[in-house]
């Protein structure tokens, strides 16, 4: 699928996260995890830090763009400005698989798995809420012809340095 918003995107961060039941022995196995994982991930995320509730592997301590987190109740891969979504998917799959090989026996079930896309856009030509809402809906909402859905509403939540903007009516008539 073509990325219609790519020319306007200033930054993008993709996050893949698996959540699971807490591992009670996590504090006791952190050293083992680091010893097993560091040789395999050192090329992309050479810096690591063991904290009370997680182990953080990063490519840079000052401004990380590639992060790999293993915690007592979740593991995640965070990548900033990947070349493509496929590149991100390959990296996330690889790192999550490595972690699962080491601590998978302690995780009976993955309770939730999710992927988040966070983007920052440059859109100086939009001066009103209605203009921006219409543009976002037209540029991002694509429903395949085979799916018999006709959207009647949309909602986009944008968090910025001064607060939060919610774009789109929450229900019919709130336009």
Where does each model-flagged region fall?
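Intrinsically disordered, low-complexity regulatory regions enriched in serine/threonine/proline
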Residues: 1-11, 91, 107-111, 160-175
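Aromatic/basic-lined ligand-recognition segments
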Residues: 112-175
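Hydrophobic, Leu/Ile/Phe/Ala-enriched alpha-helical segments that form helix-helix packing faces
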Residues: 33-45, 95-103, 140
